[in-house]
């Protein structure tokens, strides 16, 4: 519902949640004590600082440097771009998670480390200290999500602390990235749902021409456009994508709960594997179809959909970024096939297939489910 109301604003708490997850999984006890309570309360917000002007998908090319200091901290220097929620005054502090290279780092992605670099340095007692030299050097002028401050970040010797092990930054950051990819799917679902609801109301109210099968609204000069086949097709397409995406998201959320909290270690491990398999599907499939759905819903409005005052074009503009950030959808396909399927010779895919087989067996005798189960059974 929050994404339906305002995707751009919802990104602020969403990124904070991702930063929390990364620090919770890989941070030291001291880092957890300093940052997690304030991230949880919303007093501080979080970001993920990956992209640089010359590298986005290929993070092995990043140039941001981390110089060790005598007290165990690091001096971070470099430039980042496209940093969502990168600068604002909504919170007392911004907790930046920054990818950088140590002096002895090997080339490529195996030489990347992760650092927590706060906007304001944090004292041992949790109070704020001096301003850290990590600044917003510019704001991006974007097609959509105008309500989110997408910043260019200049890091000029800011003080940071290492998260996880040296040169293992991508593994630590991917805790946040995977959470973000599931979140992006949820963003697209929210926009698909609100676009559908708006288009449905409009289609019931707007009258144009008569139905091909005869007059439906005898008391009016024309019939509501919802009676026309192409309008119904567009509405049903959007509805199907919204309901399907919601079911997939709920399924993944249940798997996440099992992965985190189930008492059986094997169930936890299997659930974690399945979430990893489905994450690129949630990110790419839901956002691709969300783009189709929001465009279709704007089309239902005809010329009015192209006018800003109706709000439909914003859903299309905002949804477009979901196919790009947190790993482009083409990258998701490579991740799915290369890592999640071929990486373990299809073992996880077979586990998913077993779940589908169980569903077919359990529901195959249910006549009311036949039209849904039969197509799955022949796959």
Region annotations inferred by a language model:
Residues 181-259, 345-379:
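Extended amphipathic alpha-helical segments enriched in small hydrophobics
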Residues 73, 77-131:
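A short core secondary-structure module
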Residues 1-7, 16-21, 47-49, 77-83, ...:
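Glycine- and acidic
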Residues 145, 251, 273-351:
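Alpha-helix capping/hinge segments and adjacent helical runs
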Residues 47-88, 272-288, 292-309, 315:
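Flexible, glycine/threonine-enriched loop-and-boundary segments that flank and lead into catalytic domains
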Residues 1-33, 37, 41-42, 85, ...:
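Internal helix-loop-helix
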Residues 243-283:
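C-terminal helix-coil-helix/basic helical segment that borders enzyme active sites and/or dimer interfaces
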Residues 82, 121-137, 142, 149-180, ...:
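A glycine-rich, basic-preceded beta-loop-alpha segment at the flavin cofactor/substrate interface
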């Amino acid at each position: 519902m929050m994404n339906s109301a305002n995707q751009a604003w919802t990104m602020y708490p969403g990124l904070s949640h991702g930063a929390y997850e990364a620090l919770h999984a890989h941070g030291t006890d001291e880092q957890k004590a300093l940052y997690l309570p304030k991230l949880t309360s919303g007093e501080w917000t979080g970001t993920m600082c990956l992209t640089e002007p010359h590298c986005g998908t290929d993070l092995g090319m990043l140039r941001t440097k981390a110089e060790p200091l005598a007290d165990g901290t690091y001096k971070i220097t470099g430039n980042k771009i496209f940093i969502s929620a990168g600068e604002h005054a909504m919170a007392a502090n911004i907790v930046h998670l920054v990818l950088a290279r140590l002096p002895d780092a090997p080339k490529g992605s195996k030489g990347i480390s992760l650092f927590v670099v706060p906007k304001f340095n944090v004292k041992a007692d949790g109070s704020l200290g001096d301003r850290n030299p990590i600044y917003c050097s510019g704001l991006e002028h974007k097609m959509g999500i105008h309500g989110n401050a997408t910043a260019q970040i200049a890091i000029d010797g800011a003080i940071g602390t290492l998260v996880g092990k040296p040169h293992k930054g991508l593994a630590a950051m991917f805790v946040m990235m995977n959470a973000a990819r599931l979140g992006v799917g949820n963003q697209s679902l929210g926009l698909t749902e609100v676009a559908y609801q708006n288009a449905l109301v409009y289609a019931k109210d707007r009258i144009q021409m008569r139905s091909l099968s005869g007059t439906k609204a005898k008391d009016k000069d024309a019939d509501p456009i919802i009676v026309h086949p192409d309008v119904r097709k567009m509405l049903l397409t959007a509805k199907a994508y919204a309901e399907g995406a919601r079911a997939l998201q709920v399924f993944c959320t249940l798997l996440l709960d099992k992965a985190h909290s189930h008492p059986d270690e094997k169930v936890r491990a299997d659930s974690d594997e399945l979430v990893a398999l489905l994450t690129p599907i949630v990110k790419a499939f839901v956002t691709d179809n969300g783009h189709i759905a929001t465009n279709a819903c704007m089309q239902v409005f005809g010329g009015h959909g192209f006018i800003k005052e109706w709000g439909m074009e914003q859903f299309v503009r905002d949804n477009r970024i979901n196919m790009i950030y947190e790993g482009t959808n083409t990258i998701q396909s490579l991740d799915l096939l290369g890592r999640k399927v071929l990486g373990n010779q299809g073992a996880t895919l077979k586990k998913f297939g077993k779940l589908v087989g169980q569903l077919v067996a359990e529901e195959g005798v249910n006549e009311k489910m036949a039209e849904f189960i039969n197509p799955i059974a022949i796959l």
